[in-house]
Amino acid sequence: MTHSDANMTENGRMSGKRMIALVAALMLCVISFQLNASMITPALPDIAEELGVSVNDVSQVSSLFLLFGSIGGILITRFSDYVGRRNMLFFILFCLFVGSLLAIFSTNLPLLLVGRALQGLSSASFQISYLVLNEALDAKSFGLALGVITALNGGIGGVDGYIGGLLTEAFGFRSLFIVIIAFVVISFFGVLAAFPKNMKPASTGKFDWQGGVCITIGVVCLGRFIANGSSVSWTAPLTFGFLVAAIAGFILFYLRELRAEDPVISIEELKSRQVWPLIAGVLFTLAGVFPVINFTLVVFSQNAEVGFGMSASTSSLFFLVPPAVIGIVAAPFVGWMAPRVGWIRTLRIGLALCLIAMVVIMLFPTNLPVVVACVAVLGVAYNGLSLTTLNGLGVVLSPEASKGSLPAVSGACFGLGSSLGMALISPFASNGTVAGVRTAMIISIIIAAAAFAASLAMRAAKGAQS
């Protein structure tokens, strides 16, 4: 037996040192992307000052990054079925490298924005990593490895954002992109060395660019509709224009997929109980639970009259850091557990616990020990159980003929769901009353209940993992 054979299972999947090396390489790839999201936020005021623009203008540094993240998540993930996961990871790293160079040497905001757009395309690193793990590892190893990768989604427990602030204060915002380039270079050699050489493209046809562009327009314009409606006005002409463009994009996508020889995702697959319930589950889970942790409780806790009167830093320490840290610890364990208990069953457990915790918060919003305890429960139930299994199910339930289709579409729903939830509850959660917080919580509970209902409708394909 060769050394290489010793690191392969009986069914040809990776194990041992080769598996560890692959997971490490993929972790570096997703960290390279994630640092662009988490480290840059503290540097926005410094960027505005150095480039001579307003803080409002420099907010495009984040919004454009997220916009192109939606585009990359859909197109690049599905395109990897045709050109290979390895090639698309190299393309992602190339975009990160060039985008970071442009950011380092930018002398004006437009040049920096071009760099940020290129960096945003790399959001597909998460979905492609999940697909690679599913194809290279056995079912049980896949779950554990996916949990490890999922734990990095959203940052490294807040440490990366803190380091970003320190680097900006000491060396300026350009130092952040130098750090990112270092990670990109290490990631490149990691993928070069650890990626399985025998992994071939999953699809042999021709990518449906027309369908891909249509669904991307629909998703992006829907996201802009939600953002513009909540920040400007739901009746503003631009908001209405985004809604019309989103509807047109989805209609054109539907019509295109009906006649496409090799669709992005077929209409029959969309109608199946292994696809639409997951898309709905992702959308409603994020819309229901994300705003509770990241907005409702944070805003209420800083209200000195009816809330807990906390400072911004204390509020973060009580309500943002615990669920993030708990999620990082819980995600790998959930990934290990889900293949044994069942991916869909694990998701249902997580959503049920989310609903229980949210109902308790709604009933006792002014009881600090109770609310903090429920936030800890949400750290396990939402950050750990729900997010890990939703990411895993995107791969596990994806149709065999188009493995990248469901991760691409469901991945886009993560951002849409969180934006939708924030838009729906923010008018109530921010009105400075206990009744407003309770109303926001009731809305969140109803949406999360819809996510649980969607999980009850989920079914794996015959003979597949569930």
What would you call each of these model-derived segments?
Residues 19-32, 40-41, 55, 237, ...:
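12-transmembrane solute porter fold
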Residues 41-71, 109, 313-314:
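Extracellular/periplasmic helix-loop-helix junction of adjacent transmembrane segments
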Residues 50-52, 84, 104-111, 138, ...:
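Helix-breaking motifs and short loop linkers at transmembrane-helix boundaries and internal kinks
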Residues 70-108:
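Conserved MFS/SLC helix-loop-helix module at the cytosolic interface between two early adjacent transmembrane helices
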Residues 72-85, 168, 329-343:
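Helix-to-loop junctions at the C-terminal end of transmembrane segments
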Residues 95, 99-102, 110-118, 369-378:
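Paired small-residue
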Residues 117-151:
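Cytoplasmic helix-loop-helix junction between adjacent transmembrane helices
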Residues 169-281, 288:
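Hydrophobic transmembrane-helix bundles of small-molecule transporters
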